[in-house]
């Protein structure tokens, strides 16, 4: 895949850097694994905005992804697909024994025709899913469970991974991309490899319209609002806010710790973000 630089033939294409889709399937998603998804526009069931800057954008179909990887038979990767609902790519896997298909997160380097498996005692290859107790120290994994059988929750975005750095009884030590080191039960599953599309962080959309296509609305500065709308609002002329930067709800934005104290999972965290 990689990235592509657009020629500056228009003002909006000048400086634009996008993710190349070469190598991805151009067809429609697997019909049995996709369904229509209604956009909420950032509103909750009362119609009130709970997530700002969301709305509009192109229609999307949600892809059903196998995050649990409970099948123990071999699967063949049919194609690699773009998914509008997440940053990484998907791999469509076909199982010949019962002629079924499923989507999995595509790891970096996987290609059509590759064999993927899940279960204990299998090879350490990208796309294979097995319990953490069977993964060598130093390996990079993604799609890690926090509870056995609950499905992948850690390291699912583009270019993300966790590294197995040690063992402690029934637990495995994982170092996350944030620098946090935490304990995870060794019976939890993880998939070998790094999530695909690591170059997504280098993209530059080039124009506001491309953000709108993605369903992202503009972000208005607090100092441009009225006092009723933001703590930085109001003032005569163009003022700088008059206080340390805060969110619309008055929470400090520069370095304030937001993690709850005495959280249940504190005992599983050996090193905070570093």
From Swiss-Prot:
It comes from the Bacteria. Residues 30-54, 223-274 are annotated as: Disordered. PROSITE patterns: RIBOSOMAL_L2 (PS00467). Residues 263-274 have a biased composition (Basic and acidic residues). The keyword Ribosomal protein applies. Residues 36-48 have a biased composition (Low complexity). The keyword RNA-binding applies. One of its GO terms (molecular function) is transferase activity. Disulfide bonds: none annotated. GO terms for cellular component: large ribosomal subunit. One of its GO terms (biological process) is cytoplasmic translation. Belongs to the universal ribosomal protein uL2 family. HAMAP family: Ribosomal_uL2_B. NCBIfam families: rplB_bact. One of the primary rRNA binding proteins. Required for association of the 30S and 50S subunits to form the 70S ribosome, for tRNA binding and peptide bond formation. It has been suggested to have peptidyltransferase activity; this is somewhat controversial. Makes several contacts with the 16S rRNA in the 70S ribosome. This is Large ribosomal subunit protein uL2.
């Amino acid at each position: 895949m990689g990235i592509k630089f657009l020629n500056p033939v228009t003002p909006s294409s000048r400086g634009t850097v996008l993710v190349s889709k070469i190598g991805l399937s151009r067809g429609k998603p697997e019909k049995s694994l996709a369904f229509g998804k209604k956009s909420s526009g950032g509103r909750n069931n009362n119609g009130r905005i709970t997530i700002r800057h969301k709305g509009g954008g192109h229609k999307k179909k949600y892809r059903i992804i196998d995050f649990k990887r409970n099948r123990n038979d071999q699967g063949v990767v049919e194609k690699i697909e773009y998914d509008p609902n997440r940053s990484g790519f998907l791999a469509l896997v076909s199982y010949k024994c019962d002629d079924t298909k499923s989507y999995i997160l595509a790891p970096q380097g996987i290609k059509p025709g590759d064999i993927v498996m899940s279960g204990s005692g299998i090879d350490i290859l990208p796309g294979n899913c097995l319990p953490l107790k069977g993964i060598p120290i130093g390996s990079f994994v993604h799609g890690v469970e926090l509870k056995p059988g609950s499905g992948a929750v850690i390291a699912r975005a583009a270019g993300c991974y966790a590294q197995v750095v040690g063992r402690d009884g029934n637990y495995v030590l994982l170092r996350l991309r944030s620098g946090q080191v935490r304990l995870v039960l060794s019976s939890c599953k993880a998939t070998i490899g790094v999530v695909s599309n690591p170059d997504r962080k280098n993209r530059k959309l080039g124009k506001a319209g491309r953000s709108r296509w993605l369903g992202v609305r503009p972000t208005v500065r607090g100092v441009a609002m009225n006092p009723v709308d933001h703590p930085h609002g109001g003032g005569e002329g163009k003022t700088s806010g008059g206080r340390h930067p805060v969110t619309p709800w008055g929470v400090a934005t520069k370095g304030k710790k937001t993690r709850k104290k005495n959280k249940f999972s504190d005992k599983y965290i050996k090193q905070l973000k570093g």
